[in-house]
């Protein structure tokens, strides 16, 4: 839900409506003092922290588990974006212009990542190299973030 809000995915999409219907009341009731984007992120962090605390409560301090949950949530977000970009590349070959709701979400999320890169890298000879650059940048940012947070723990 946080990624749908962050990338401004169309809320008339049936899949987004289902997620919003079930997850928005939970995040609003627990984190009523935050805006909806931060509430959804806080809910995902809380759920990840509770799952790690239940699994590893005897071996780690709670602050360490919190940092591990932050790293895992951010890593999951980057993996989703990574696979959305790969999915949009495959879909552009296989089924361009398909109106399936899930495919629309994949296209909108990958376009949000690739659109700033397309401003700097024009298509060369009919080939679009922005997905390759986007995947490299996503991997670089994810790896550097994980190393920075891991060094803090």
Predicted regions and their residues:
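Selective transmembrane helix interface/packing segments
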Residues: 1-153
């Amino acid at each position: 839900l946080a990624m749908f809000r962050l990338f401004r995915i169309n809320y008339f999409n049936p899949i987004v409506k289902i997620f919003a219907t079930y997850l928005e009341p939970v995040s609003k009731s627990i984190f009523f003092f935050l805006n909806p984007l931060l509430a959804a992120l806080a809910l995902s962090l809380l759920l990840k922290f509770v799952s790690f605390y239940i699994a590893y409560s005897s071996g780690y301090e709670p602050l360490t588990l919190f940092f591990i949950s932050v790293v895992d949530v951010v890593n999951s977000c980057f993996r989703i974006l990574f696979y959305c970009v790969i999915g949009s590349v495959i879909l552009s070959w296989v089924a361009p212009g398909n109106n399936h709701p899930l495919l629309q979400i994949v296209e909108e999320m990958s376009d949000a990542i690739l659109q700033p890169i397309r401003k700097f890298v024009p298509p060369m000879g009919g080939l679009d190299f922005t997905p390759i650059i986007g995947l490299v940048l996503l991997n670089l940012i994810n790896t550097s973030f994980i190393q920075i947070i891991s060094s803090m723990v």
